Amino acid sequence: MLIQKILLNKEISRLPRILSILNYTGLRWLSGSSGRNTTELQRIFDDSKYWQSLSENTTQYTKETGLFKNPYLTSTDGLRQFSHDSLHKAHKLAEILRNSVSKEEKVHYIMNLDQLSDTLCRVIDLCEFLRSAHPDQSYVEAAQMCHEEMFEFMNVLNTDVVLCNKLKEVLEDPEILKVLSEEERKVGEILLDDFEKSGIYMKAGIREQFIELSQQISVIGQEFINNTDYVAKEFIKVKRDEMDKSGISPLLTARLNRDLTGKYYKIPTYGQIPLQILKSCPDEDIRKEVWAALHNCPKAQIQRLNQLVRLRVILSNLLGKQSYSDYQLDNKMAGSPENVKGFIKTLMNVTKPLAARELEFIARDKLNAPDSRHMSDNEILSIVKPWDKNYFSSKYDSDNEMAMIRDEQLRYYFSLGNVINGLSELFKRIYGITLQPSRTENGETWSPDVRRLDVISEEEGLVGVIYCDLFERVGKISNPAHFTVCCSRQVYPDENDFTTIQTGQNSDGTVFQLPVISLVCNFSTVALPNGNRTCFLHMNEIETLFHEMGHAMHSMLGRTRLQNISGTRCATDFVELPSILMEHFARDIRVLRTIGSHYETSEPAPEALLNDYLDKTQFLQHCETYSQAKMAMLDQKLHGSFSLSDIERIDSAKIYQKLETRLQVLADDESNWCGRFGHLFGYGATYYSYLFDRAIASKVWDSLFKDDPFNRTGGEKFKERVLKWGGLKNPWSCIADVLEKPDLAKGGAEAMTYIGDSEDL
């Protein structure tokens, strides 16, 4: 396709951009009465009063603009006009491409295709973000409409025989190939493959079917995503006498509503109450009922998933593929469904016995079995149910209540500003990159809580922009995300209108389109005695922020001439590597000690507290890895081979429960949770990528950073051998280079097995 979307958007001269950095770097801020010194970067996230005063000054003294400094984006009408004008520009570019006949035109053909792709991407990626994160519903609706319109045109282009044939002519002409850059040849090969995956050589009627099917999949997939947070019932009824006799705390039952008869408690399926019941109710039947209610989705959601799977079966059959997985895994690192299943099975074989041993304490507790009695893995796995995990884990944790208290204490060493500032310091040490606050113009952001960070390279200056939308907001998406709004690319030769993009300049004077990304999280704030509201991060939230910043660095440092292969526009089963590698930094005590300082005393985070936390992260970690492997196998199962005659009988919930029963380890044979597994749309047939990249990241960490997480040599190695290539270089070659294992360069089943043979993920 002309767009490779990832998991899953002013007037300026060609002179170097004058950075609108707030000139406060180095300025010190007195926090309350503690005497704590902070940097400007830290202050804009931690001091809500200061941020409010800055925002008011911005409103008073800066000029008006649109979202992301795009002057169109001041209203929903402007968004629609931007989409309309971009579509008009795309039509003109497509016509120029169709009429390319001279040698000079053919030499520039791939670059012009990339420009066409960029024109589409800048609308589709923008709308992907707006429909997910904008607080104004009218923007969400306008973005959905523009996305559908542009996505449909993209699918039309993907089946344009004239465009495809001319691209083939270019790639088969030795004289033209001689003058094309490596990037142009790579992009040409990618785009030709995308044409072929779209059934370009089939009859016109079939190509039209492809367009229609792709559009239907996009629409039903978005509906599926939009409904993953909903449970089947708002509450369930449990008999009062059974609940009262269960041994659960009367303080908890006193918080429950009763039905009209007074004979039943109404247990909600949202909030903290059902989670507290799972942790504290000794009655297994009640826990089972509550657990299933929390995991069940409405039948309509299963119907959406079934329809999504059916449409993908029809699409893959139309294109002559055995399965949707076959279709998706072309040109991925894995190469084939067989290799993916082999990787998952290898990982499961390593992990399953370790997971069983982790659950042994629950099995013994349930049976009151003495330590002297041997319990086989199968016996353990047949005894321990998913609704047991929270209850018995809570009993286990309650033996060390001080550890729980220390966990809560720990977060006050990690304000959001502390962590962002620490990330900047880390990036400076390993990559030569810093994050600097930048003043925004009126209308540049979609919420007053959004902070803009300019990404500054020691060698290149301004290399990108990150918009941080990190604080909780009503109606905001619940999952953290990295959105590519605008890709890095060199300015095209005939480009002279920079009003809708932000630009930078390389050290050699080359002008390029700045990569612009948005990081979206939902972190809560607390009120402090001095009247400020500050966000203190739990340790898992720190890991989340590091993960998303890993994606951001990939976007910033993967700076290629052409946007089709810049940053995160790479193989789906490679794209999570930089982000998961960052999780290792977030779990390293040396890094955490550098970042953490108490918000009142400025003392560094105590080593004992951090060690306690890191020890707790190992609790049931193999169960978590195995759970991810089951999800990856479900993804392969739902996108495996189905005959067209069988598609009406596809029942994703039955497939899910049957697979769970066979694979064991906290097997779910009670709920239809698969309807809440949103990645089945965005990562259809490629969810294994998460585990695969975890396994690779573990090996990269051990090779480059385990001995010293601040190692500049290791950072430069990862930057030069992985990050800077974006999607240009074969991922297996990148891995072979960074691990210094040449045999991995050819990929295939043996390489997949090597990666899958990992315990420490």
UniProtKB/Swiss-Prot annotation:
Question: Which terms in the Gene Ontology molecular function aspect does this entry carry?
Answer: metal ion binding; metalloendopeptidase activity
Statement: the UniProt record of this protein carries the keyword Zinc: yes
SUPFAM superfamilies according to UniProt:
Metalloproteases ('zincins'), catalytic domain (SSF55486)
Enzyme Commission numbers on file? 3.4.24.59
Q: What is stated as this protein's family in its record?
A: Belongs to the peptidase M3 family.
Q: What does this protein do?
A: Cleaves proteins, imported into the mitochondrion, to their mature size. While most mitochondrial precursor proteins are processed to the mature form in one step by mitochondrial processing peptidase (MPP), the sequential cleavage by MIP of an octapeptide after initial processing by MPP is a required step for a subgroup of nuclear-encoded precursor proteins destined for the matrix or the inner membrane.
Name assigned to this protein? Mitochondrial intermediate peptidase
Species name: Candida glabrata (strain ATCC 2001 / BCRC 20586 / JCM 3761 / NBRC 0622 / NRRL Y-65 / CBS 138) (Yeast)
Q: What gene name is given for the protein in this entry?
A: OCT1
